[in-house]
């Protein structure tokens, strides 16, 4: 692949990484601001968002081959990608187990927190550290990851499968199982058809789509050697770079966050109207009307929080 093609891939990576990084910051702000919506499911989403943050940050690091930056970028990229895929699987599992028993995760969240963090953070860190000693990190066409100069040589295929792709393909299979199971359970039970499962199921779906596209490109590379198809590489980079952004968008449009933002904006709007009316009107009728409007909005916020807790059992 020539330098101009690498530049195109690098540009797409930077654009996707920048948008993902900005969206993760917004997600962290909302997590801090809307404390009343926090739940264990919300907490899991924040862990996944942190993986996206690491991936976005690593994709924006300097692209300098044979430098310390290349090793750092490769390490963070491999860690965050593996972690992100595992968290998508955890979201699918959380959705499935919650459809069977709504309060199960909340009741055993201490146990699940240890298991999830060990699986989705500790394991990728150890795996990426092991790969460091194999000396296969390097130029991966526009970014530092697994060196494309050695990736498709026979002696490295086993290492690649064992250290990354085998895990990646296993995650794809598990996510497909969760997706099919969730759809089947939704069809059989009208009780489970609510907004919570409608948006959580998209985490494993998005991950499967992105990983399948990456797999197609890798298999194509195995057959064609180092003559990687540029179009396939562009498609893979687009899906890889924007996967994190899509995950954050799913989170931002989730029932708890989107409704909380709407209610908050209504409160601000009604308070401004209240101040404006009280300053311009001498009578108290409009003031009473505005107080009632504000009281109504506050009730909407309270009712919404209660509805999330009662209907979904998991908050958001």
Predicted regions: what they are:
Residues 89-90, 96, 162-191, 201-217, ...:
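Class A (rhodopsin-like) GPCR signature focused on the TM5-ICL3 interface and adjacent 7TM helical core
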Residues 202-203, 208-210, 215-218, 229-279:
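Seventh transmembrane helix
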Residues 36-40, 97-112, 176-199, 253-283:
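Intracellular signaling interfaces of 7-transmembrane GPCRs
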Residues 10, 51-94, 98, 104-105:
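Extracellular TM2-ECL1-early TM3 structural module of rhodopsin-like
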Residues 123-184:
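Extracellular-loop-to-transmembrane junctions of the mid-late helices
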Residues 259-316:
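Non-transmembrane, juxtamembrane loop and terminal tail segments
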Residues 28, 38-51, 70-77, 104-125, ...:
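Class A (rhodopsin-like) GPCR intracellular loop-transmembrane helix junctions
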Residues 7-36, 49, 53, 93, ...:
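First transmembrane helix
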